[in-house]
Amino acid sequence: KNSSIANTMSATYMALAAFFPANLPRNEGTFRSVSLVMPEGSAVNPRPPAPMTMNTVFIAHQIIHAIWQALGSARPDLACAGWGRAIHPISAGHDGARDHDFIMYHWHGMPGAGAVEGRDGFGQIGHLNALGGLTIPNLEDYEQLYPVRYIRQELRCDGGGPGKWRGGTGIEYTVETDNPAVFYFRSEGLGPPSGYGAHDGHAGA
């Protein structure tokens, strides 16, 4: 993945703001003192026609984590442990009962947030770039809007990293549909867990 200059800057500022004291404004005056080195042709400043699909979600996640890990080594008391990466699918098909096509984003299949000093991480919090600002949909609403039925939805057992403060965990769920549907999966959330430990904590599963 590649990141546009605007996305690289916003991800950097967001990562830095997490270390600011509460009384320090999050505005242009504060960030004006920050100098970003973004080599042209790199992943953080690509040349056209480099693809940048969903750069606000996936490579932004890596940028934020890189900054958090660097600053966390200097100030572990302010460090936030890593957040999980999303792998929620998209379902598309035809709703026979309502006779129209549908596209359903599985926003409820979200990862957990890392812990910080003094607080456990939140479970099923959403994408890191939203810092918990994404509203997780209600399953009953989804069952009314789409031709699906949820069999179960539960917090994943021991998904959060152990430590003095426990990391948040993601979701395991089972859903079935009454109609033929195509499922698309984002693969960025596969592979080694991204929920690294901080301040002597351990990584999530």
Model-derived regions, located:
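Glycine/proline-enriched, intrinsically flexible loops and inter-domain linkers
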Residues: K1-A205
